[in-house]
């Protein structure tokens, strides 16, 4: 979707803003519900700084005298307009910090907060921790179920829910009941809830809201938050260790040439870099390849989670009720299930998770989600209500046997970048936060004992293996892969029940993930074609209507961030065999094949990058593995609400 033209308030990078003024500006900006624009630069003094927040409210400009010295403070250099434009010839500004964290989800924020707390308690208040987040605001790109197991939160903030805490988190709904159902097309059959899914003592939340709250707490302890900064490149020392990251260049047109607004990205040099990008992060992929971190682990497998938030009729609301289902609408050869959580005031979170190792290229996770809502059990709750939010995100399902090496020279993987999702438990936030806290402790210890240079976080790897993360993931390691064995879905249910109730992970074997998700995809000619019913516009919706609820926004005149080297070659290799699988696995209508008589196949492959909601499914599932998801301009993408 094209960016909207607005009147801008230039605000500088947060580290340059006095705290009193930052607080005032933030309060003013939060009152605006308008979509923000994405002009990339603002000029202060003699240096060009990237805008972090840009929201309309008045025609005034704030002038600030405070600024930090950078290792390179450059005058504006206009890029050459020649065909041979090479941005790497233009020097980037850089800033040196102690720890750089990429990603403002629960893992990254927990790591940042824990680091600064440790440093502050040690009297080392000059210890710099920065966190880069590609979304325009913390929480904007976060989507999750979410029933929170509060163990890590209780440790990080013991009073996070206390009535005596004026800054307490106010949006947690205590879980009251658990139900599990196996769905047929018309019926819902009660089945036992596995012990891992017992939610007594847990809380139904919006993870997006929780991350916003954690962001505020992070600033209070001195973390430097940079939302709107999209890290796009890993930087290396001469010895090959990671020395930080760089943000992407701005002001490059779709044709690859610089515009008048061109600005080079910025480098952040750090002695330790923690990657907290979530599932299948673009920098995480680079680091895993560079250091061969998967050499001793099995292939990762993924799922796609789709979620809507509905406001329902008060008489149908059951605060704290939790429902999970298996079976319909998914076919027998597709792993997955749905959830329905009653939270807040007359709100429900409804979602479907589909394992991306499904074989049938005719299957559409979005289409299956819309079918789910017409099941009598679900429809009876939604009728008379209103869908107010939609989102989708890939998630890790590989479990214990797919965890890579998590430490590398100069940094570590934390949260879903490493893959700590507990699939049978349907939870990953507590493990993500726990991993971030463990990495923070290891990083501070390593840096405190080394005067210079990058570090290796040996203590982090050891800490993981001695943590509750390792214990609980090892216990359930055989459940998810059991559904991909000759046992099938019903055999997988029985086997998982035996593991859950009797063996509890003590079996001497570990089941394997035998292939990757793209390799699991069969040719369209080998599979039954699936026709999806037309949405009614009341309970079910067409995909563009749903995308409009995400608030996603990308400037059109920029290079496509969904990188396909040769679009025609991709179509020739993919379309005849898979018949447009990209259009069906994408939950945002980004990919399509358009009739075009001038093309050899009679169709043209098209990428509608403006629709992208940053779910990463294309990078994971495409059988030809030639779609490379990269970060667009900072601040772009979805602006999720209550997800």
Language-model segments: residues:
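N-terminal mitochondrial targeting presequence
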Residues: 1-87
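A short, basic/flexible loop-to-alpha-helix module at the beginning of a structural domain
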Residues: 80-96, 121, 256-265
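N-terminal Rossmann-like FAD-binding beta1-loop-alpha1 element of flavoenzymes
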Residues: 98-130
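N-terminal FAD cofactor-binding segment of flavoenzymes
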Residues: 126, 134-185
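Predominantly flavin-linked oxidoreductase catalytic cores and closely associated redox partners
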Residues: 217-380, 438
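FAD-binding beta-loop-beta segment adjacent to the flavin cofactor pocket
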Residues: 393-423, 546-557, 571-585
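Active-site-proximal substrate-binding core of FAD-dependent oxidoreductases
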Residues: 419, 423-425, 441-488, 601, ...
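Iron-sulfur cluster-binding cysteine motifs and their immediate structural context
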Residues: 576-639
